């Protein structure tokens, strides 16, 4: 819902939406394993993902490992390093079982992909993107598309959730670290090179960013009703800083980006007004839902075109 990837990629290539289906199931499976519940959800989700598409299965594997690592330290802390080997063995066994289930289709596809000219080709990977990429980066998170399949286009209200997250001091450290890390992936071409199978630079993994944004917003939603005055001031500072940095470069001040930032300002001020201008939780719920719907419709309007196969 939050990701422009859903609107853009699923229209152009429907199977590009597959990883957005499998990733939540795999992550739920990881949580079940940590709770010492049955591993069936994890095994079958990984197996079906492997049967579906090797290209996205590779990316899913990377984010699966990252999530498992983050969840481990969140649940057990750094003082439980002695248990790392045990959990590595558990996940290795279940992952091997899943891969063996998918092997009848997965292995032939892997051999075919490894033999293609595209995979064997040597690709130039720059250290940084062009200057304009960084000038438009912040605004493009909720606005227009980036280069190299960097289709973010998140609903503006989800960025409000990010402000709330970082306003909460000494809480949600794992989510904060994950958010910073995934932005670093977008800022350096080498990450796009690695996540694209060490081929040319492409950010077709950005659907995982959308998953993180959605998860953060869901976690922050209850916090919207319990913000202290100090936290509201911090959120206001974040909002002002984002608006200035996002729209300061001339290249970033496009119509789509300006409207997206306007929606962000309205959504954030609505959240900050709760408890002062209005006090009914239902009103905030309705307005937050309204901004979410408007953000989705806004992205659809600017993303689709009546030309070029309905893609802008």
Give names to the regions the model predicted:
Residues 37, 56, 177-186, 196, ...:
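Contiguous transmembrane helix-bundle modules in multi-pass membrane proteins
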Residues 29, 40-54, 97-100, 241-243:
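Membrane-interface alpha helices of multi-pass inner-membrane proteins
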Residues 60-96, 266-273:
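Perimembrane helix-loop-helix junctions
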Residues 23-32, 49, 63-71, 214-222, ...:
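Hydrophobic transmembrane alpha-helices
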Residues 87-203, 250-256:
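Periplasmic/ER-lumenal interhelical loops and adjacent helix-loop junctions
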Residues 33-48, 80-92, 229-241:
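Short hydrophobic alpha-helices at membrane interfaces in multi-pass membrane enzymes
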Residues 60, 101-112, 298-306:
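C-terminal TM-helix exit segments that contain a strictly Trp-centered aromatic cap at the helix terminus
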Residues 1-27, 34, 50-60, 145-158, ...:
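Membrane-interface micro-motifs in multi-pass membrane enzymes
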């Amino acid at each position: 819902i939050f990701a422009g990837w859903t609107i853009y990629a699923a229209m152009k290539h429907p199977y590009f939406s597959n990883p957005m289906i499998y990733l939540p199931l795999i992550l739920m499976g990881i949580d079940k394993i940590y709770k010492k519940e049955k591993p069936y959800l994890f095994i079958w989700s990984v197996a079906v993902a492997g049967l579906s598409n090797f290209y996205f299965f590779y990316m899913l594997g990377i984010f699966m490992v990252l999530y498992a690592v983050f969840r481990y330290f969140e649940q057990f802390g750094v003082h439980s390093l002695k248990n790392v080997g045990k959990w590595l063995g558990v996940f290795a066994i279940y992952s091997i079982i899943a891969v063996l289930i998918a092997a009848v289709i997965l292995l032939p596809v892997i051999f075919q992909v490894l033999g293609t000219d595209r995979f064997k080709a040597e690709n130039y990977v720059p250290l940084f993107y062009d200057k304009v990429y960084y000038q438009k980066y912040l605004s493009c998170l909720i606005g227009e598309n980036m280069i190299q399949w960097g289709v973010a286009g998140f609903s503006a209200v989800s960025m409000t959730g990010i402000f709330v997250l970082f306003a909460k001091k000494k809480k949600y450290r794992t989510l904060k670290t994950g958010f910073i890390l995934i932005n670093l992936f977008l800022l350096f071409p080498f990450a796009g090179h690695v996540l694209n199978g060490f081929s040319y630079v492409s950010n077709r993994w950005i659907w995982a960013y959308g998953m993180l944004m959605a998860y953060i917003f869901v976690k922050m939603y209850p916090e919207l009703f319990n913000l202290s005055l100090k936290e509201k001031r911090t959120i206001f500072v974040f909002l002002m800083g984002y608006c200035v940095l996002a729209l300061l470069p001339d290249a970033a001040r496009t119509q789509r980006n300006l409207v997206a930032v306007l929606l962000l300002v309205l959504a954030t001020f609505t959240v900050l007004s709760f408890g002062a201008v209005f006090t009914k939780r239902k009103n905030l719920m309705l307005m937050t839902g309204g901004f979410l719907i408007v953000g989705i419709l806004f992205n659809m309007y600017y993303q689709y075109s009546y030309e070029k196969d309905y893609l802008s």
